[in-house]
Amino acid sequence: MKIAYVEVDAIMSQYKFCKDYSLVLQKKGQNIQNTLAAKQRALQSAAANFQQKVQQNAYTREQAEAIQAGLQKQNNDLQALNQRLTTEFQTETDSYNTALRDSIQHFLAVYNKDKKYSLILSKAGDNLLYADKAFDITNEVVAGLNKAYKPSEKLEAAVKK
């Protein structure tokens, strides 16, 4: 039986597909955080301003209730936005992980037509207690993955942003 293994960490750090998508997801995550933080600061500022004016008796009771209801709606909208953006980000991350797994499996299927391995294992952390380096095909796999990788125009544009 012919066996080989691939270092997952090396694929994650050297495969261009991973690098590109990691950068895109990192930028997207940062944009989400920045958007939510800015809206949170604006809401806090509006709430502080409201409190100050309430203490100065600048509003009638009806005005204060209307403004407070508006602030509560803004807070609810912010929470809904947070939930929506988090869900969208998770969906995109899941899609990336699926595409990554599919690209690796597709490459290994083609690669293995010539190599004829019975088993190709993934080595991540210490999931393999011992493996002789002679069975390590990581460099070949990473080189082959990178050679086959053709980023979409959409991805290239997102990476360059």
Description of each model-found segment:
Residues 1-161:
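Amphipathic, charged alpha-helical segments and their helix-to-coil junctions
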